[in-house]
Amino acid sequence: MLATPASARIVQARGQWAAIEEQGHCRAMARSLRDSARDQPQAYVALLFDLARRSVGTVSVRLGRPLRAGGSVILTVGEQPFLLKGQGWFAWSRGPAQEAAIVAAMRGAGGMRVDSRDGAGRRNVDRYLLDGAATAIDAAAATCAQQ
């Protein structure tokens, strides 16, 4: 399960995923199956819903290691790859069309992975199970819509 700030409220949790509401925005989140090194924050993936910012399903990834300058981040859902934009420790979806395609792929796949290379050129792969993802996404979207 994910560690959440004290101000966050877990709306729903199932499988590897949880829907979280905090200060006017909602997220569907899961942590990487690979535990991070002791001195590193845990990698995670989140879909953000925030109507005030017109964000409906923005995909955000906290990488396991910082991205190499100018490097690429590939999110592969099932067998379908998506090129994300990234910088430092984070990567993001490229817009509403890609976000809709990612969510659709997540609903039909069993797992996904995020591939990148760090500053030393080492490959970084974070894997996620999608058990509970659709339910968490729907719960986060519904909670956000009620605000």
Label the model's feature ranges.
Residues A6-Q147:
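A generic "folded-domain core" signal
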Residues M1-A3:
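Bacterial N-terminal signal peptides
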